[in-house]
Amino acid sequence: MAAAAMAISPSIHLHLHLHLHHPPRLHRLLHLSTTSPYPWLSAWPTAHRRRVPLRRPASALDLRPEPSPSSDSDDDAAFGTSRSSSRSAMSLILSRLRNSGYSYSPPELPPRPPRGSVEDVFRVDDGVVPNARGGFDDDAESALVDARFPWELPMPPPEAGPRAARSKAWMAELTLPEAELRRLRHAGMRLKSRIKVGGAGVTREIVERIRDRWRNDEVVRIKVTGTPALNMRLFHEILERKTGGLVIWRSGTSVSLYRGVAYDIPEPTKGTSKNTQTLGMKSSIKEPPGHSLLPNEKVNEMQDNNGALVSNAEKDTLVEPVPEIKYEDEIDKLLDELGPRYDDWPRPDPSPVDADLLPATVPGYKPPFRVLPYGVRPSLSRRDTTNLRRLARGLPPHFALGRSRQLQGLAAAMVKLWEKSSIAKIALKRGVQLTTSERMAEDIKKLTGGVMLSRNNDFMVFYRGKDFLSPELAEKLLERERWAKSLQDEEQARLNAASSFSSRTEAPVEPTVAGTLGETLEANSKYGNKLDENYENKMTRTVEAARHADLVRKLEWKLQLAQKKIEKAERVLGKVETALKPTEGIQPPETITDEERFMFRKLGLRMKAFLLLGRRGVFDGTIENMHLHWKYRELVKILVKAKSFGDVKKIALSLEAESGGILVSVDKVSKGYAIVVFRGKDYARPSKLRPRNLLSKRKALARSIEIQRREALSHHIATLNRRVKKLKAELLQMEGVKEEGDVELYAKLDSAYSSDEEDVEDEDDEAYLRSFDNSVAVQNGDDRTSLDGSDANSDDEGDYSDEDDDEDDDNDEEDGFDYENDDEDDVPPTTSDGDLYNHTDFGSSDSENYVSLSGRGDPDVKSKGSALDSRNSYSEQSTELTNTCS
């Protein structure tokens, strides 16, 4: 009993300690931690271990007022729930039945937290942990199993050491004991001399130096610089593969290389058996034993459509099974036939041919003979070029080149390679000085006649071309060409010998003159009509009349073409003006007196801030800038550069109607015409500054260009009509003087003939619909700045859709003028009568033309204004514009 009491006492002591120092829930966790590897999972209620359906997601934050118990909500009817209790109608019925005693009532659920509280917004079911995406899974069991802390994950088995998780490249750690590896690393640290590896990588010289060091030391220190230092993991693998040693330590660009335990008898490592060829010698590849084919059954290598090497062994239907041919063996055999291999190739096998060891010059070398088949396009299409480039991207290089000239040996090897492969890929050696890939590519193209597909700092890819011929076929064609040339030379020699031989026995025969030019001239001199002066004049008039009629027909054809163009311009202009709905001229609700008009004109002309109206005319941006200007001033001065006063009058009336202001005056100033508009006494800024009934900035530019094109075509048509009428009249005059010549008329006709501009071909009929003429920008160079401050010579736009109007609106908001003027901020918005008559100095603008815009007001002031009108305005313009405004 005492022993039992002694055995139980520790557990009793633990329970007493838990009850005294820990709360009940923590007590439960500590109690279950001794029996479960995951105590926090075992501590959860058993109800959560089953598949528990999650609650219906509610809104994150619902601040709507609480509904009354008697009110019915449409939202509740839609979801079948009650907003106050989040329960369905069926659950309410069941709760009432349970309260009446008809069914068993389960324990009540905890009350829902108040709406809008932190618990309501960030509520999560107990035991459910968010997944990796931050959401919750429908499967509660999977959520419980996968939601583990890192320290709760299953531990790896004890026998699995830390070395197994590391990279496989550290072969030294897997093969050497820990104590031996530590000793070798310390020995490498004590070494002072290091072997430097440059940009060329692990070359043959580097391998020889490492092996020389291994004769005395078992560890060699290596320092890596240049391009190989960018990828030390790859350098690690290349160094072990080429030297046969083991990398025991690596830090940054420093490496310690161990020669190995059995250095005296080195075993060939992976990839070194294929790089043991002697320089300048070709290795012979023997056929596999037991394999002998007849000459007719020899496996021929052909090309598929993409240029890859394909064996015909699969196509031959032989009774005996054909052995499988590996691609690596075939490509090694092909490269061995081309020349010596590059031993310092840092990339995986197969190693390419060293082009620097090929002969620099080949006696009697000529570019290969090429003949393009009939009906074949000489150049490659884009699709073919792309396919060939993609094919060459995955192929290993065939040659490694490091020199820029004397490439005849490489060219001969490439031609030999093209017999079996349509692509030749050349790798450029790294670390070689004074090499230019561009010069290499040009020399190779001249020597081989191939097509360069791609060129970069690492590779060059050449295609043999569609006109490439195999050596057998090229030799046959050259032989036939030489044979044909010999036949031609023999025939020419026979003709030369026959012409030099003459027979003396026969009498010489005179050559006949029948059908020759001499016979024709002799017959005309004997039997033809002699050309006198009348005949020459008659022929001259006939020729002139024919030329005149031809010119008339040509002008009529041009007239028809111009009429077609103007019809198209009218259609395009009508299409652009579909969105233009100008406001009809309505009398403004308020007017100003003559005194106010005189004062406003004086102040407006003296304003320094102004708006420049460009070639676009009145559009939505114009009205917007007027309202922006009226934010700081009551007046706005607009400068217009127009050809006639009628155009200025239309613009002024349009500005008054669209902006809702009052037109004050239109004056002729040095910069064109100045239009002064008053915003009104009861001015209220509209909600939308840009009226929707006007054109946008882009469409206004298109409209101005189409109008200018129509005017130019109209002028051109009028000119053509005048010329046609004039030529027809001269043609009738020529018929009147048919019998006798008229020197003055012929001189006039010579001046009316077509010049060089008549021979210029007309442009495409639809070209002007897609682009804007550059001449428009030159002719309107002064009108480059529009009302919104943007450049009128914008990029050509052929599509005048409404989709780009919003982008134009944003650009207009960024652009604009600075309407602030420090000198004018002190000027009061209104001027008294005394100030009106005291300011007699009107400046330079008083000498310009002034137009009165109203016939109403005080007669005294009106008489004073008439004196100014007689001195400063045009009477016709004033009367016309005044009648229109009144």
UniProtKB/Swiss-Prot annotation:
At the top level, the lineage of the source is Eukaryota
Question: What residue range does the UniProt record give for the transit peptide?
Answer: 1-70
- Looking at the record, the residues that make up the CRM domain are 174-270, 378-475, 590-690
Relate the protein's function as given in its record: Binds specific group II introns in chloroplasts and facilitates their splicing. Acts on subgroup IIB introns. The substrates of the subgroup IIB also require the CRM domain proteins CAF1 or CAF2, with a simultaneous binding of CFM3 and CAF1 or CAF2. May influence the biogenesis of the mitochondrial small ribosomal subunit.
In Swiss-Prot or TrEMBL terms, this protein is called CRM-domain containing factor CFM3, chloroplastic/mitochondrial
Its localization reads: Plastid, Chloroplast; Mitochondrion
Q: Does the keyword Ribonucleoprotein apply?
A: yes
InterPro entries (alphabetical): CRS1/CFM2/CFM3, RNA-binding_CRM, YhbY-like_sf
Knockout consequences: Albino leaves with little, if any, plastid rRNA.
Q: What are the Acidic residues biased-composition ranges?
A: 793-827
One of its Pfam families is: CRS1_YhbY
Q: Which UniProt keywords apply?
A: Chloroplast, Coiled coil, Mitochondrion, mRNA processing, mRNA splicing, Plastid, Repeat, Ribonucleoprotein, RNA-binding, Transit peptide
Q: What is its main location?
A: plastid
Q: How does it assemble?
A: Interacts with RNA. Part of large ribonucleo-protein particles that contain CAF1 and/or CAF2, and RNC1.
